[in-house]
Amino acid sequence: MYQGEFNWSNLAIIGIEIHKNAVNKGFWDEELPPSHYQGMIVSELGEMINAHRAGLITKVDLDELINETDDEKFKKRFEEEVKNNYEDEGADVVIRALDALANNGESEMRTHLVDTLSQMDKSLRAELEEKGKMEEYKELSMPSRVYYIIRTAGYMDIQHGLIGSLCHIITEMRLIAETLNFDLMKHIQVKMRYNEMRPYKHSKNY
C-alpha cells in the first residue's frame, strides 16, 4: 500500500502502486488491446452518471476513513457510505486511467506524467477562461461533462495516442471534482485501500 502523500505531485508514484495492485488482482493476466482498458474507463464514466443521477453522494468525512486503522471497520464503512457514490465512480475513472498509463511504461510515467498533466490542466483552464466558458462549464449536467470527456479523449487518441487520451481524461476529472467540490485525491486514496482488500478480479470476469 502506498504510504506517501496523496497529491497531484505524487500521481505517477500513486499510479504505479495502482498498477501493481491491478496486476496482483489478475486484471493484466491476459494480453488485451488498449481499447479494452479505454472501454472500461468509459464504463466507469457511465456509472458516474448513473450514481449522480440517483443522488448517490458521499456524506461521510473521508478523513475518518483514512485514519481508520481497523481494516474490517474501514471496509464496512466504505461499503456502506462511499462505495458506488458518484465521487467513488469518479475516482475509479482516474484509477483505471493511471493503471493503463503505468502499464504503458513506468519510467516514462515517472518522468513525464506530472508535467504533462500540469500543462494540460493549464491549457484547459486557459481555454475555458479565454472563451468565457468557465462558468458555463460549471453549470453543465453530468452527462454533458462525460460526453465532452469521451469526445475529446477520442480526438486525443487519434492525434496524440493512448497517453494523450488518458492524460486528458485525468485532467477533465480533476476539473470536474473541483467544480463539484469533492476531494478526488481522498476518494482515490480510500478506493485504493479498499481495492487491495478485494478478491481476484473483484469477483468479475474482467
Locate predicted features:
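Flexible "arm" and connector segments at domain edges
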Residues: 1-206
